[in-house]
Swiss-Prot record:
Mn(2+) binds at D55, D172. It is found in: Cell membrane. This is Dolichyl-monophosphooligosaccharide--protein glycotransferase AglB. Keywords: Cell membrane, Glycosyltransferase, Magnesium, Manganese, Membrane, Metal-binding, Transferase, Transmembrane, Transmembrane helix. InterPro entries: AglB-like_core (IPR054479), AglB_P1 (IPR041154), Oligo_trans_STT3 (IPR003674), OlisacTrfase_arch (IPR026410), STT3_N (IPR048307). The chain crosses the membrane at residues 15-35, 119-139, 142-162, 175-195, 216-232, 238-254, 264-284, 296-316, 332-352, 397-417, 486-506, 507-527, 545-565. The gene is aglB. A motif (DXD motif 2) lies at residues 172-174. Its main location: membrane. It catalyses: an archaeal dolichyl phosphooligosaccharide + [protein]-L-asparagine = an archaeal dolichyl phosphate + a glycoprotein with the oligosaccharide chain attached by N-beta-D-glycosyl linkage to a protein L-asparagine. GO terms for molecular function: glycosyltransferase activity; metal ion binding; oligosaccharyl transferase activity. Oligosaccharyl transferase (OST) that catalyzes the initial transfer of a defined glycan (a hexose-linked tetrasaccharide composed of a hexose, 2 hexuronic acids and a methyl ester of hexuronic acid in H.volcanii) from the lipid carrier dolichol-monophosphate to an asparagine residue within an Asn-X-Ser/Thr consensus motif in nascent polypeptide chains, the first step in protein N-glycosylation. Involved in the assembly of an N-linked pentasaccharide that decorates the S-layer glycoprotein and flagellins. The keyword Nucleus does not apply. It comes from Haloferax volcanii (strain ATCC 29605 / DSM 3757 / JCM 8879 / NBRC 14742 / NCIMB 2012 / VKM B-1768 / DS2) (Halobacterium volcanii). A motif (DKi motif) lies at residues 701-712.
Amino acid sequence: MSDEQTKYSPSIAELARDWYHIPVLSTIILVMLWIRLRSYDAFIREGTVFFSGNDAWYHLRQVEYTVRNWPATMPFDPWTEFPFGRTAGQFGTIYDQLVATAALVVGLGSPSSDLVAKSLLVAPAVFGALTVIPTYLIGKRLGGRLGGLFGAVILMLLPGTFLQRGLVGFADHNIVEPFFMGFAVLAIMIALTVADREKPVWELVAARDLDALREPLKWSVLAGVATAIYMWSWPPGILLVGIFGLFLVLKMASDYVRGRSPEHTAFVGAISMTVTGLLMFIPIEEPGFGVTDFGFLQPLFSLGVALGAVFLAALARWWESNDVDERYYPAVVGGTMLVGIVLFSLVLPSVFDSIARNFLRTVGFSAGAATRTISEAQPFLAANVLQSNGQTAVGRIMSEYGFTFFTGALAAVWLVAKPLVKGGNSRKIGYAVGSLALIGVLFLIPALPAGIGSALGVEPSLVSLTIVTALIVGAVMQADYESERLFVLVWAAIITSAAFTQVRFNYYLAVVVAVMNAYLLREALGIDFVGLANVERFDDISYGQVAAVVIAVLLILTPVLIIPIQLGNGGVSQTAMQASQTGPGTVTQWDGSLTWMQNNTPAEGEFGGESNRMEYYGTYEYTDDFDYPDGAYGVMSWWDYGHWITVLGERIPNANPFQGGATEAANYLLAEDEQQAESVLTSMGDDGEGDQTRYVMVDWQMASTDAKFSAPTVFYDESNISRSDFYNPMFRLQEQGEQTTVAAASSLKDQRYYESLMVRLYAYHGSAREASPIVVDWEERTSADGSTTFRVTPSDGQAVRTFDNMSAAEEYVANDPTSQIGGIGTFPEERVSALEHYRLVKSSNSSALRSGSYQRSLISEGNTYGLQPQALVPNNPAWVKTFERVPGATVDGSGAPANTTVTARVQMRDLTTGTNFTYTQQAQTDADGEFTMTLPYSTTGYDEYGPDNGYTNVSVRAAGGYAFTGPTSVTGNSTIVSYQAENVAVDEGLVNGAEDGTVQVTLERNEQELDLPGDSSSEDSSSEDGTSDGSQTNESASTSTSASVDASAVSAAA
């Protein structure tokens, strides 16, 4: 090497100093990827790929479609939300296109379904790891390379929502959102900085001076493209446009007040948002203004922000040319915005209401009751979540971020305060100190914002947010803030608000926390004692300086992120390594039932023998009400399970995790009789197509008050009812010295719970159920402040009492207002009548007893009422039960006494679980002794029907024929008179509607001599009114027998 080459060749030390961040960042990415892929094998079960959650399954459908139609995404999907269909909305986005492209590349243009599924399986881990790149780059701009790497390390170690959404298997679009938002924020920051440096103004634009405008124009266009790509991944990403718009107002008003031209910032806003708006016209799917779908809202709102930037710049020019006092400019800007909002609300009220509602439930701490039934949409510090986890608010934050949230908040405070205090202006310093004091008061005295909120009728958190926002605006108007830092501050504030409004947005907040800590590290290194901010040579660094930095970093990172710690009563925190263990979850318990449905029910379009099979991956054009062919049908379940039904069952759910059909599903599943359920179905669709719903799937969680049962009560709107109409909490207290604690808690169910359709299906399989002589007793207690009353088990410890007969139980309840019959387990308060058009056709192989949550629920209920949990387990507690809605076989009966009760019974055999149950239905005879029934269970003809001819291959079959019994009476002294018809066959074709006709049943009168000592039989048979004309009917005898069995089970367990 020549001397000249040696002279200009960089040394190893120089290379390390210039490029050390590359290997460090690469290592961080690899570690993040490894952590996120550790559970890969858990998602491959017997060669089948599973995913966790619900939305990932619909992304699988979208990716499969895009692979078949690359690069197009599905424009409309009739395979969900029967009988309407819907657009994919925030599914079928650039995320699905990227995954499909990867699968096509790896599969050499023809990937197998297994490869497509595995590509989607690992996608969240890849995007989660790659999010560290924009995080580092933003952190580098705020805190230098060392700060950027510190932020990257924090992101790597976070164990909370950001990690969970980026784990293998959680293939929702969530984790791709912060990835693309990060790059959009970065591009906007660069564009703003370039504009501050190059200073583009109107004169340069008018003169078309491209040389002067080239750099700000280039970066503004890139910022617009990056923002559009972010919204292509998630249409509600319009939030970032709103954040940028808010920044533009603050920055341009501040610049003008402080004597700078607002046109530099306006240039970035106008160009970038125009580009974003134009690009957002490309993916429009439906001509509407919905926030969650690709419609007109995204492009028009973006163009509105661009136009607003131009207007504010023009207003500033007019202000200056007319020599108006610049101090009034911000007030006029604020007034103009207010007038614009009012006009918008008047001209387009529905659009305004939609935007305002979504804004408040996203960042305004105002998520509604229906939204809060979604676990990921609950407030981050929701009281019920903290209580159930035994956590404090600080403990909850610590479990998610460790100390990094608090150090990030400190960085944000310093970012606001630094420009105020650095000039030594006492007024500005006083403002900063006063603002911090006020924020501290709001935090330490929550009753203050609560009182203001109560007076104004708004959430206390929204009051605090408004006050803090006003303080930040005041600070911005008084000091000089770098454009990109002010933008980051506004972005951080809104994202923090969103994360505390809905817990899911913590996967965004993780990036904010990381970059704010990057900024904090740089500021800390610049403290005189440390003095490392501008060090160029390692020789200039002392051991004391290094030790100070290392100790500070370890204090931030070690608790929670590196070493788990105890968080109050909420248990021990988890590190990222510990929290990365995951699996597919409940879907594996549904898979068998959905596979059965795919193979044993008619294909869509072929029900009843029709020949209109729907193409599963077909291309369907947008419509607001899809015209389904004859033979298509819906499958009703709670909306959580809709995507599983679509993808794993290849059937069309009525409701889905888009919450489409959620209200109708709630009204149907909680219907108190078949007539109400039928009216719900016929109300769906203009021509009542909802009546073509053929199957209902119910799992144990839907029927459990400790799981999902409460969710439909929030959506239900058929009448004004609430959760308390179905069940109420019951507590068992325990005295420990002078302290009283809750030893156990469960629920006491009302009759309305047992009469809801989904409970009648899951618990009783549509059969009638008699009340049992079991009484639950309680005491009323009042809370310490006297505002609430609640139920506790009696102080003598006996919460459940059993009686020999119903009369005795009813007499006890009549004399004790704090007691009721039944209300625990599957024991109703009153008789529950049979369903006529629903039959169990399949139980899952898996039992609910495999669920830890189900077991804990049984144990808790048993402990509350002093019972063994076994007494509360229903017959056949399968995880999932599938029912068919059938016309039913009509029975025309005769031969019974007039105006009496006839009971039909048949024993059914569940071929999957190997258990038996008896279906029972009763009917009243007329004056001629005739009766009519509609029976949903058949006894013969199973082999003649199946999916090949448009019907169901049922997995629940009769063990014999029906038995029909009329009243039993004792006449004279020794003759028993009964009416019976045994082993009556009901053909499958009559039940499923394939055949016309009725079942004719004639009850035969039987007499049998009863040989009893003495003449007491006639007295025993007398009714309460003194008659002996057969008043002791078979119905009452059946009730007595059933009651004694139930009562003995509970009594033995007590």
